[in-house]
Amino acid sequence: MHDAQIRVAIAGAGGRMGRQLIQAALGMDGVQLGAALEREGSSLLGSDAGELAGAGKTGVTVQSSLEAVKDDFDIFIDFTRPEGTLAHLAFCRQHGKGIVIGTTGFDDAGKQAIRDAAQDIGIVFAANFSVGVNVMLKLLEKAAKVMGDYTDIEIIEAHHRHKVDAPSGTALAMGEAIAHALDKDLKACAVYSREGYTGERVPGTIGFATVRAGDIVGEHTAMFADIGERIEITHKASSRMTFANGAVRSAIWLKSKPNGLFDMSDVLNLNNL
């Protein structure tokens, strides 16, 4: 292994996203797949991670114990569920390993645990790791500053039938970007559901609508609607590889950061645009 390479460990190796992450790690220059993890009792334990992902034999077998592979990776990549991610986060903090977190659905306590851990280790935490989505978030900030005070703002998102949290983390990130640009607190202005006799739309609110159907990878639209015209800013993902490649790219970037909490805008240097 060349000194410039970083070794990554992939959580949830047998899942849809886990397999894509393995493919991305194996296909990206400067990266070595060091470990792959699955939950205790999984039928996939002992499988070759590369074969599991359809990328050929790698010699890296799927394990259930982080302790057993702690010397095999530099950066941990986790797109699982909040309770599992927080356990992995605690391990990484204890052992000085950076972590890339793509898990969504954290409550306030979980988000605080991530902030606390960032005092000791480097963390990239993002709702969406695609380059396109993060460019969209920057566009939303600019659109909100120009149009947000006098338009009705709605965010519509669609995902596959298996997604367990709603609204999506990306939809919430869109709302946060818009609210921040307008000096608002999203918790105070978000409307997550409408049913029955709701009365007229309350000015200054940000509405959310959710679709769960079929195999939709991810579609997000922000609408700025006025009387007579509206602007819609949309991102559509057709492959999870865009998220996987972004996450592995983040791991490479994170290797040089001893501690701190970052997101994709830092990785892509979007804050200077």
From Swiss-Prot:
Localization per record: Cytoplasm
Q: According to its UniProt record, which residues of this chain constitute the active site?
A: 159, 163
Query: At which positions is (S)-2,3,4,5-tetrahydrodipicolinate bound?
Result: 160, 169-170
Catalytic activity field: (S)-2,3,4,5-tetrahydrodipicolinate + NAD(+) + H2O = (2S,4S)-4-hydroxy-2,3,4,5-tetrahydrodipicolinate + NADH + H(+); (S)-2,3,4,5-tetrahydrodipicolinate + NADP(+) + H2O = (2S,4S)-4-hydroxy-2,3,4,5-tetrahydrodipicolinate + NADPH + H(+)
Q: Which Pfam families match?
A: DapB_C, DapB_N
Q: What's the Enzyme Commission number for this chain?
A: 1.17.1.8
Question: Sorted alphabetically, which InterPro entries does this protein's record hold?
Answer: DapB_C, DapB_N, DapB_N_CS, DHDPR_bac, NAD(P)-bd_dom_sf
SUPFAM superfamilies, A to Z: Glyceraldehyde-3-phosphate dehydrogenase-like, C-terminal domain (SSF55347), NAD(P)-binding Rossmann-fold domains (SSF51735)
Q: Does the keyword Cytoplasm apply?
A: yes
The record's section on HAMAP family has:
DapB (MF_00102)
Q: Which family does it belong to?
A: Belongs to the DapB family.
Q: What is this protein called?
A: 4-hydroxy-tetrahydrodipicolinate reductase
Source species of the chain? Citrobacter koseri (strain ATCC BAA-895 / CDC 4225-83 / SGSC4696)
